[in-house]
Every structure is written in structure tokens, then in C-alpha cells.
């Protein structure tokens, strides 16, 4: 090996800096590759802002447009409660009427006291009235039930918001993990490009001195060009992923962002506590079941009589000429009347309307219970599958990581042998291809492992830990 090294130095004095200190630089290269492996990168510009997963989650929860709509719906449902509560309060209305009886009606009364069988009286042509009317329910079971229904609907609105918030946390986390995986891929491709550029320089030097064929130089250039295309594609993909992330969290589109690097040595496994009994999917269905049961009660309460308090204060005037409204005197006199009473409403027959509504509600209740059973079994299946996937993905991740490191070592050995003139260019390129494949498998296994971890956090009810105790 030393003779080969001396031979190279003597034949290629111009390339002495490339070959003479190779073994002295080997440790430094490995250190650089380790940094590339873990995805450590320096932001390309001062304008880039590095966002952690926790930053993205907090920003998204506060600013996501769809979640803001859900938040407004939650606020709106509170007014529905006040709206139904207002039905229990007195309702006071002011009314006014004016009539022009151009063909006045008549009033017929007993006229025997006047020597006539009937006494016919004509109504004056013009009359007007105005005043106030009062109505207040004293007992109306339907109104009481509708108030309790509005409270359940408010609860459903709150649960819908919390579920949308949880779904947003999952969406942002998956997008963040995907962006981290692409960033990690870029770092590995960049390190591979550096390796091939060094190999190209060595091969070019060999070719210039008659120790390699032109086809070897072309092979390296082809692989180098392919890697550059992969790098450009990954860079474009990362840009799209970051743009989509900014859209989801409603981050200013003109600002440049970067993600924190992945720490593959510090992945916190989820605590497998079993499927949570407090998942929003189940709580929503339970609240909807309660809603349907109360709606059934409200239909049944429609058969119960209702009692209301009524009252009025009215002023009425009559005249035979329109101009008298603007004159004082007997022809423009207003008569006051007032009263208070009770109004009882007893339902007797509604054409079987409530009966049909009750049957529909029974079917809705049966359907919601079937949906509960289906959702429960579905979530249980998801949990079992996710648990199996977690173990499998964890095992695959460790294997692919070992394979990646092993493929890198094999490539380094083959590169050394090529520099010494022992291995062929074909062997180097084959090992480089195997190393690239191992890198891609490693990145894919890492991403799958993290996503499975995320799914189990959701199913076990621990998704909120991402906001307070997450690891990037």
C-alpha cells in the first residue's frame, strides 16, 4: 500500500495534495459525513427563521383559517342557548292599525226596546287602534326541552372544535416530519455528491496519466449528474412542502422558514396505555345520541298542554271623515281598553305528525348507536394495527440505519481500494448505488416510524404532549 502511495506521488506530483494526505483526512471526512447524516445544516440566509414543531403547532392553532371558522361556530352556538332562554321571558310588542271601511260593515242587535225587531247600526268609515300586547309562557315543556337541546348542541360544537384542533395537530406534525425527512435526504445527497466529486477528480487524474479509461470518467459524471438531479428534485419538493406547511399554519408566505434537524438518537417512544376511552370521535357520537334522545322527548312533550299569560293595553278611535283625525272634538276621541288573561293550548290531533317524527327519531337513534359500535371497533383495529406497525417500523428503522452505516463503510473501503488501484470503477459505482438505496430506505423507515408514533399518540389520548413535551 505504501509503495502504491509513493508511486502515485511520484507519477502525479500535481495531485500530491489529493492523494498524499488521504489517510490523514479520512477521520475528518467521516466526521463531516456524520454531521451530514444527522441533518445538521446552516441556514442559507439570515432571513430564514427556524421553526420547531411546537412553534408550528402553536402558530397553526392560533391562525389556521379552518380552525378559526370552527372557533366562530363554537361561539355562535352559545348564542343559540341565549336565544332559547329568551323564549321563557315576556314578549312585549307594540301594534298599530288604521282601516278605511269605504263600505262599512253593519252591526245588528235586538231592537225590541225601540219597537223594531232588529236594530241595525253602521260602523264608521275610519277607525284606528294602537297599543301593547304581552305574552309570557307560564308552562311549556317544549320550550324547556329545546333549551336543554341547545346546550347539547353547544357541547357538540365544542367537541367538533376540539376534534378539528386535534386533526390539525396531526396534519401539521406529519407535514413537519415529512419536511424533516426531505431535509435529511438533501443532506445525504449533498454528502454523496461531495464523495463523487472527489472520485471524479481522482478518476480524471488517473485518465490524464493513462491509468484509467475515458469511459470510467463518463460513468462517474453520469452518476454525479443523476445525484445532482436528485438533489434538485428534493430541493423543489422541500420548497413545496414548506409552502404547504406555511399555508396550513397561515404563516406569511413571503417569509423563508427552515425546520430543526432530526435527532435520530433521541426518539421518544409512545407510552402504550391502551385505546383511550375519551377520544373525540366517541364523545361526539355520544353527544349526538343524547341530542336525538332529547329531540324524541321534545316530540313527546308536544302532546302536553301549554299555558301562557296574555295582556294588552289598547287605544281605539273612530270617525266618519278622514279630516277629523286632525281636529279636536268628539269625532277624534281615543278610547282606552286593557286586560289580562290566560291562554291554554291543548293539542288534540295533528294529523299523525308527531307520531311520524317520533318513528324517524327512533331510526336516527338506532343509526347513531350503530355508528358508535362501528367507530369503537374501527378505533380498536387502528390501535392494534398501529401497535404492530410501531414494533415493525422500529425494528425496520434500526435495521435500515445499520444497513446505511454498513453501506457507507463498504463504499469507503471500495473507494480506498480504487485509489490504490485494486478495485475497479464498476465496483465503486455499484457500492455507491447500494449506499444511496440504503440511505433512501433508512429515511423512509425513519419517517414511517415517527408517523406510527404520532398515530399512537392520538389513539392513546396523548397528542397534546406534542405542544409541551415534544421532541423534534
Walk through the language-model features, giving the residues of each.
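Bacterial Sec-dependent N-terminal signal peptides
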Residues: 1-57, 61-64, 443, 468-472
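Acidic, low-complexity, intrinsically disordered peripheral segments
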Residues: 24-26, 441-472
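Bacterial Sec-pathway N-terminal export signals of envelope proteins
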Residues: 47-93, 97, 103, 253, ...
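Sec/SRP-type N-terminal targeting helices
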Residues: 68-72, 85-86, 138-165, 215, ...
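Periplasmic alpha-helical coiled-coil/stalk elements that build and connect Gram-negative outer-membrane
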Residues: 79, 165-278, 393
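Small/polar, glycine/serine/threonine/aspartate-rich low-complexity segments that form flexible
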Residues: 95-132, 310-346, 470-472
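Short terminal targeting/anchoring segments
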Residues: 215, 420-444
Amino acid at each position: 500500500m505504501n509503495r502504491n502511495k509513493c508511486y502515485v506521488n511520484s507519477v502525479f506530483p500535481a495531485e500530491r495534495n489529493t492523494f498524499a494526505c488521504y489517510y490523514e483526512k479520512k477521520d475528518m471526512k467521516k466526521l463531516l459525513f456524520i454531521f451530514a447524516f444527522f441533518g445538521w445544516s446552516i441556514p442559507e440566509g439570515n432571513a430564514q427563521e427556524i421553526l420547531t414543531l411546537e412553534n408550528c403547532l402553536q402558530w397553526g392553532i392560533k391562525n389556521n383559517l379552518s380552525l378559526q371558522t370552527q372557533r366562530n361556530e363554537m361561539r355562535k352556538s352559545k348564542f343559540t342557548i341565549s336565544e332559547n332562554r329568551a323564549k321563557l321571558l315576556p314578549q312585549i310588542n307594540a301594534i298599530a292599525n288604521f282601516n278605511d271601511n269605504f263600505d262599512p260593515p253593519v252591526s245588528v242587535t235586538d231592537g225590541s226596546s225601540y219597537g223594531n225587531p232588529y236594530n241595525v247600526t253602521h260602523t264608521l268609515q275610519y277607525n284606528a287602534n294602537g297599543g301593547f300586547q304581552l305574552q309570557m309562557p307560564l308552562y311549556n315543556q317544549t320550550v324547556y326541552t329545546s333549551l336543554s337541546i341547545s346546550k347539547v348542541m353547544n357541547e357538540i360544537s365544542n367537541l367538533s372544535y376540539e376534534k378539528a384542533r386535534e386533526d390539525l395537530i396531526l396534519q401539521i406534525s406529519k407535514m413537519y416530519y415529512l419536511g424533516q425527512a426531505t431535509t435529511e435526504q438533501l443532506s445525504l445527497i449533498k454528502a454523496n455528491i461531495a464523495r463523487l466529486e472527489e472520485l471524479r477528480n481522482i478518476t480524471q487524474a488517473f485518465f490524464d496519466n493513462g491509468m484509467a479509461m475515458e469511459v470510467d470518467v463518463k460513468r462517474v459524471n453520469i452518476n454525479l449528474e443523476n445525484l445532482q438531479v436528485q438533489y434538485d428534485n428534493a430541493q423543489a419538493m422541500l420548497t413545496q412542502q414548506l409552502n404547504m406547511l406555511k399555508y396550513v399554519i397561515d404563516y406569511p408566505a413571503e417569509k423563508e422558514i427552515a425546520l430543526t434537524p432530526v435527532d435520530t438518537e433521541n426518539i421518544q417512544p409512545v407510552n402504550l396505555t391502551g385505546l383511550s376511552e375519551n377520544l373525540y370521535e366517541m364523545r361526539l357520537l355520544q353527544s349526538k345520541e343524547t341530542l336525538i334522545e332529547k329531540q324524541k322527548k321534545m316530540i313527546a312533550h308536544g302532546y302536553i298542554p301549554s299555558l301562557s299569560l296574555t295582556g294588552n293595553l289598547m287605544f281605539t278611535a273612530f270617525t266618519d271623515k278622514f279630516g277629523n283625525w286632525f281636529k279636536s272634538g268628539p269625532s277624534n276621541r281615543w278610547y282606552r281598553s286593557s286586560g289580562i288573561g290566560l291562554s291554554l293550548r291543548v293539542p288534540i290531533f295533528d294529523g299523525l305528525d308527531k307520531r311520524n317524527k317520533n318513528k324517524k327519531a327512533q331510526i336516527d337513534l338506532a343509526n347513531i348507536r350503530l355508528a358508535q359500535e362501528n367507530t369503537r371497533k374501527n378505533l380498536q383495529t387502528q390501535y392494534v394495527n398501529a401497535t404492530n406497525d410501531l414494533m415493525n417500523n422500529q425494528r425496520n428503522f434500526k435495521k435500515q440505519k445499520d444497513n446505511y452505516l454498513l453501506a457507507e463503510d463498504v463504499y469507503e473501503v471500495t473507494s480506498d481500494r480504487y485509489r490504490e488501484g485494486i478495485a475497479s470503477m464498476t465496483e465503486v459505482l455499484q457500492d455507491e448505488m447500494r449506499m444511496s438505496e440504503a440511505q433512501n430506505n433508512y429515511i423512509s423507515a425513519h419517517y414511517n416510524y415517527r408517523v406510527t408514533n404520532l398515530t399512537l399518540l392520538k389513539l392513546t389520548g396523548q397528542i397534546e404532549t406534542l405542544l409541551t413535551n415534544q421532541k423534534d
